[in-house]
Design a protein with these regions (language model features):
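Noncatalytic linker/hinge segments flanking ATPase motor cores
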Residues: 74, 87-88, 207-208, 217-223, ...
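Generic preference for hydrophobic/aromatic residues in regular secondary structure cores
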Residues: 122-130, 134-138, 214, 223, ...
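Charge-rich, low-complexity amphipathic helices
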Residues: 122-125, 235, 239-240, 274-279
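Charge-rich, low-complexity intrinsically disordered segments
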Residues: 254-309
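Acyl-donor binding region in acyl/amide transferases
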Residues: 161, 170-263
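Non-catalytic substrate-recognition and accessory regions of acyl/acetyltransferase enzymes
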Residues: 2-195, 288-309
Length: 309
């Protein structure tokens, strides 16, 4: 009997729930909240069939105990809005399982370690003007409603942009679905963004992050990218309408369209490679700056490929 088979036989939904809900110290602070645990049990009783099926499927993934240790909120994820508005509990369960089934299908290599790591992994490190440092990381999604993975761009160790996504099936194809695009924390002023843009020759942090993202998912053999808009972001769900009204102000559509993204139904279909301006179309006095911009983008591509292959 293999270790994987043994792990699957020993691990079951009851044991999984006991370990995340009853064992202290709790594997995630939310499980330590009595209100959260009560809500979890109540929601399980409201949707028993889908919940039991989901728990069984989780326990039949490869090395399920290790996965739950690294992602302790997985049992509760189907109970709350996920990825975008209107996604029912069955579709939420399917999306989560599709992501981990896809990720676990990889051979044992750098990519798989990055995708399943419980910590952030460096994907790119580069320098801008004046010794400014830009680092891009991949790690578990810190915004648990927006997917399973997050890429984070840091400027001189300050996070300025985060892109959250999952690998799911859509219209019969494997895609990367971007469900969140966050800027810096509230305490980070706009001057930091201006400094980062200036030190990267006019490249916005989100633009650099998207270059890293497209390179990374290509390394994962995924060519199709879709994204939510600000109108169907998960926080537009009715239950968050007033709670998040003042905090959610992002205009996703504007950024997607700047990348030549195309609206397809409720989602945007995004390019897997952003087209660059031809040299002859750039005014001569700006060509030197554009060369430096493209050098930074090329460096990001090289760094991501180097760290993930």
């Amino acid at each position: 009997m293999s270790m994987q088979q043994s792990d699957m036989e020993r691990y079951n939904p009851l044991l999984m729930l006991k370990e995340v809900m009853a064992q202290t110290p709790y594997r995630h602070k939310r499980w330590g909240e009595r209100k959260f645990r009560y809500k979890f049990v109540l929601r399980c009783l409201i949707n028993p069939v889908t919940t039991i099926k989901y728990f069984n499927e989780l326990c039949h993934l490869n090395q399920p105990r290790t996965l739950i240790i690294h992602r302790p909120l997985l049992p509760a994820k189907i109970q709350r809005p996920y990825l975008y508005t209107g996604l029912g509990i069955r579709c939420r369960a399917r999306a989560i399982l599709e992501h981990y089934q896809f990720v676990q299908s990889f051979p044992e290599n750098k990519i798989k370690k990055i995708l399943l790591s419980e910590e952030q992994t460096l994907l790119a490190h580069l320098e801008g003007k004046n010794g400014a440092l830009v680092d891009i990381y991949c790690g578990p999604c810190g915004y648990d409603r927006e997917g399973e993975l997050t890429l984070t761009l840091c400027f001189n160790d300050t996070p300025l942009a985060r892109l959250s996504f999952s690998f799911i099936r859509h219209e019969g194809k494997q895609i990367a679905l971007v469900a969140g695009l966050q800027g810096p924390s509230k305490h980070v002023g706009p001057q930091v963004i201006r400094n980062a843009t200036k030190d990267c020759y006019g490249l916005f942090p989100k633009r650099m992050l998207y270059e890293a993202f497209t390179t990374f998912i290509q390394a994962c053999n995924v060519a199709e990218i879709y994204a939510v808009s600000e109108n169907n972001h998960v926080y537009r769900q009715f239950r968050y309408l007033f709670q998040k009204k003042k905090t959610f102000v992002a205009s996703y559509s504007e950024f997607w369209e700047s990348l030549n993204g195309v609206k397809k139904g409720a989602l945007y279909h995004l390019p897997s490679q952003v087209m660059r301006k031809a040299p002859e179309s750039i005014p001569s006095k700006k060509r030197a700056e554009y060369r430096k911009r493209y050098h930074i983008l090329d460096t990001i591509v090289q760094e991501v490929n180097s760290h993930s292959q």
